[in-house]
């Protein structure tokens, strides 16, 4: 009971009267303020009116002498920094000197596409790039033009070769050693007929076969194409993608172009075998044999005219039936609608005989009879999974060597 009485001054005032200072405290506070007013005015802090430049020196003077001694040290350190030779050695050259040669070099871009003509000494000496120019080798000269990348150089070469397919293209392809960095052109030098032709994209995608050099004297080549004899391939270089297909009657039709391999084939009239049918090797990889085009409609198997060892591009087994499965034993296909490459049944003419000349290929002449349709062993569809050429396993009239 004694504790609440002792702590009354510490408790909450429950009466609710206003809290004021006691009169004794107010009298002592007034006396202390009146007595201390005079010395407070005398002991006011000093005010310094200084400028920005003198602020550091005044602060150092007020704080003490050690900071004043450290003041001349930073200028000494700054004076030693420009004398550092390592920083001067690794300092890069100014960017203005690198961007300056980019103005005259785009006009010299066509000669720059060849490594032999890449060096341009008249344009390089005016710029004092002594540290970079001696290190630039034969192929590093391409990087002198910082605004051009190898891809842009290659695209400019393609545009120049496509646009100027006349004397300019022949001038740029006298020898294939001038284009070592172009993909796909490493395979072209051993094809004799391609030196005079302009480079086209998609031309490097065709497989080159040993019989490719016989294009210039093929009988169907001189009849079908309207180009002169020394240039047997301008017809093919007009289109960068699929090539014109050889009709069964011989002449090329420009409106008949092959679809990409493996896509929907287009119907081709199969009335008579092409004169190229009796040739030892095919003319182009994308112009298959006439009998094979009945089924595939232009599926690009390179060596089907000569029964070469090359397999079908999509077959994992032996070669499918070169004549196409629709031509089983009768001239008319029993499954015209189920065959991928035949949109309508087409009878073969009587002169489409399996002669000895037509059977000559890379594996030698066959022994098939020339009178009537033969009865050869069945096609691989009977013993293996179905070949991509058809849906039904049917014997092939041309497989008499197997």
Swiss-Prot record:
Phenotypic effect of disruption: Reduced seed size and early endosperm cellularization.
Biased composition range(s): Polar residues: 24-44, 76-87, 160-173, 349-358
Motif (VQ): 55-64
Domain of life: Eukaryota
Keyword list, A-Z: Nucleus, Stress response
Leader peptide range in chain numbering: none
Pfam families: VQ (PF05678)
Bias kind Low complexity: ranges: 218-240, 381-390
Region Disordered, annotated ranges: 1-44, 63-135, 160-266, 346-402
Ranges annotated as biased composition (Pro residues): 103-113, 257-266, 371-380
Coiled-coil portions: none
A GO CC annotation given for this chain: polar nucleus
GO biological process: endosperm development; regulation of seed growth
Location(s) in or outside the cell: Nucleus
Assembly: Interacts with WRKY10. Interacts with MPK6.
Function: Modulates seed size by negatively regulating the cellularization of syncytial endosperm. May function by binding and modulating the activity of WRKY10 transcription factor.
Protein name (Swiss-Prot/TrEMBL): Protein HAIKU1
Organism (species): Arabidopsis thaliana
Gene: IKU1
């Amino acid at each position: 009971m004694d504790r609440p009485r002792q702590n009354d001054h510490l408790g909450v005032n429950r009466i609710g009267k206003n809290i004021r200072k006691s009169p004794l405290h107010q009298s002592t506070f007034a006396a202390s303020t009146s007595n201390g007013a005079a010395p407070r005015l005398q002991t006011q802090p000093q005010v310094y009116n200084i400028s920005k430049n003198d602020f550091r020196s005044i602060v150092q003077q007020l704080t003490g002498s050690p900071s004043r001694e450290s003041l001349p040290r930073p200028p000494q350190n700054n004076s030693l920094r420009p004398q550092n030779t390592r920083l001067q050695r690794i300092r890069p050259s100014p960017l203005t000197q690198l961007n300056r040669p980019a103005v005259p070099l785009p006009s010299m871009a066509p000669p720059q596409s060849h490594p032999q003509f890449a060096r341009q000494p008249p344009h390089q000496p005016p710029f004092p790039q002594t540290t970079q120019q001696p290190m630039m080798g034969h192929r590093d000269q391409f990087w002198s033009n910082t605004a051009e990348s190898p891809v842009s150089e290659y695209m400019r070469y393609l545009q120049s070769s496509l646009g100027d397919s006349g004397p300019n293209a022949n001038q740029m392809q006298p020898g294939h050693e001038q284009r070592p960095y172009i993909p796909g052109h490493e395979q072209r030098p051993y094809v004799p007929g391609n030196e005079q032709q302009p480079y086209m994209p998609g031309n490097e995608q065709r497989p080159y076969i040993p019989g490719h050099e016989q294009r210039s004297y093929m009988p169907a080549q001189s009849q079908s194409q309207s180009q002169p004899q020394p240039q047997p391939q301008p017809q093919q270089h007009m289109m960068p993608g699929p090539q014109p297909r050889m009709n069964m009657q011989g002449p090329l039709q420009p409106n008949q172009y092959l679809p990409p391999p493996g896509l929907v084939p287009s119907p081709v009239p199969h009335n008579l075998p092409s004169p190229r049918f009796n040739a030892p090797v095919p003319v182009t990889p994308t112009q298959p044999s006439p009998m094979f085009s009945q089924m595939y409609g232009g599926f690009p198997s390179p060596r089907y005219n000569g029964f070469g060892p090359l397999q079908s591009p999509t077959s994992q087994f032996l070669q499918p039936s070169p004549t196409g499965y629709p031509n089983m034993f009768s001239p008319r296909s029993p499954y015209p609608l189920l065959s991928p490459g035949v949109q309508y049944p087409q009878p073969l003419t009587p002169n489409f005989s399996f002669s000895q000349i037509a059977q000559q290929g890379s594996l030698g002449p066959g022994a098939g009879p020339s009178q009537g349709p033969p009865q050869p062993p069945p096609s691989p569809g009977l013993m293996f999974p179905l070949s991509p050429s058809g849906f039904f396993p049917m014997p092939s009239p041309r497989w008499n060597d197997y």
